[in-house]
Amino acid sequence: MPGPMGGGRRRQMGAKPKVKNPGKILGRILGYTFKNYKIHMIIVFICIIVSVLANVQGTLFIQSLIDDYITPLMNTSSPDFTPLLFAMARVAGFYLLGAASTFAYSKLMVYVTQGTMRNLRIDIFSHMESLPIKFFDTHSHGDIMSVYTNDIDTLRQMISQSMVQLFSSTITIVSVLVSMISISIPLTLLTLVMVAVMFIVSGKIGGKSSKYFTAQQDDLGKVNGYIEEMMNGQKVVKVFNHESKAVEEFNELNDKLFDSAYNANKFANILMPINAQLGNISYVLCAIVGGVLAFNHFAGLTLGGLVAFMTFNKNFSQPINQISMQLNSIIMALAGADRIFKLLDEKPEEDDGYVNLVNAKIVDGKIEPSEERTGVWAWKHTHSEDGATEYRQLKGDLVMDDVDFGYTDDKMVLHNIDLYAKPGQKIAFVGSTGAGKTTITNLINRFYDIQDGKIRYDGININKIKKADLRRSLGIVLQETHLFTDTVMENIRYGRLDATDEEVIAAAKLANADSFIRKLPHGYDTVLTGDGGNLSQGQRQMLAIARAAVANPPALILDEATSSIDTRTEKIVQDGMDKLMKGRTTFVIAHRLSTVRNSDCIIVLEHGRIIEKGTHEQLIEQKGKYYQLYTGKTA
């Protein structure tokens, strides 16, 4: 469905409504649970078995209590209640043991469940951080957030409740069935007939609700994704007066969620009452038939045996009802787990690079590694042939040689890109929106890999450079600056986490940010919230420049860094940028062409191709596309 401005939204996770391989998914869930809590789970299962057997034994002893203690006392003129009291204490002991075991495994399961959820969240987040930029460009952020909230929560409920209940109910059914057979085979057969009816009903209703529970999780993710998208784009929505359109689209998604949730819970909620009524019918039938059998002493059935059997009858139908109830929770949890594991199964960003970036020093004209920050950087290249290590100084020389690129293999967006940036040069990319300016910088960072051609950094194919080291060598200042909920000091320090306070302040001064920072309520200790919403766009960009400055990178990428601020602020920001760019190879993308006049080379792009290249003066003389963009006139 199109977004509020007609474009398609990012695709959602878990697009197919049916969970594939539920057994495999359940196995992975159990694997996560047992991985760190094997001993705890063994104790839990032992406690469950003890609890069930204690309760069954207590119920089974009721037969002896009535037949061997209560009935004889009724025919005695001077009864001695001492044996009865001891027998009652024995029954109470069984039930107390069962209660203690239940308390123990319930408390343990809280610890196991929360620990498993903690580990799972860590694994999800760690894996998410290893994913390529392409994943976040093609998936709804709100849908990803739904994995951390809704899907994790449904899985938590399954592990803490459904899994334990399923095991407990299974043990209860088996032990109760054996006990019922020992009391009366005819009544047991009657009970099993009613149980068979329950299973048939549960299968029919459960089958209908299964697909809707899966769809419910997917639709919930879509609603969350849309809300997140609209919150981020609220200014755009209001500028274009698309509030009613946004509400209309939200209602459409919300209605789909209503339909799937209604259908899922409609079938799920009628399952327990139906099974409860079938259980009541089974109880009444067994009471009538059992009364007749006990009255006639058929097959050795006594009054005590009948009372015990009727208790077991209730205990037998109850776990079956619980299983049918938990099956719906398990189905929902499997749908959530499916989305979780789809995220975990996303392929991490590949990195086959082996050239590292290291601090270096020059000794007798030679490059050597240094343990300290010297301001000199070098590429450490260990040759696989002979194991020799070569150090090559990082100068910022970058070459793109006949590069072709497409976000998909069947549609190229860059064609035959050739450029050469000498160390310390300022290279500017200009062109219409969608011409390919930002795409080129994404290739330099290796956020995406090219289909054809070569990109060399200081003569080294960038595919050979480890991505983390490549990106460490490139400072980035984006138009949309992302600030974290933390102090101004820590937001700047994010550029280099081991930077001292003095280095952070020096970087802020270089970016011309120091003066406005000191006017904030708590200066550098002011906590920014809401992505720095209380700062102006210019102030946010100054912090971005300071963040890049504290990293002290050898090269820079300035992506449309001053296209949305006023002229006065732009001069302040531009002055900070000029200080930052000094002595560094810099790639600039700007809508205000006045900011790139002093570039060493201006590259004009159109439809993914370089159509002009040269200095400002040279391009003005050519009176081509750049001339049109700069002057607004046609040659």
Model-flagged regions — what are they?
Residues 27, 46, 101, 105, ...:
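Hydrophobic alpha-helical transmembrane segments of ABC transporter permease domains
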Residues 72, 179-193, 263, 267-338, ...:
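Helix-loop-helix
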Residues 1-55, 70-91, 105-109, 113, ...:
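Membrane-integrated ABC transporters
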Residues 124, 128, 237, 340, ...:
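Helix-loop junctions and hydrophobic alpha-helical segments within the transmembrane domains
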Residues 36, 40-53, 91-94, 161-215, ...:
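Transmembrane helices of ABC transporter permease
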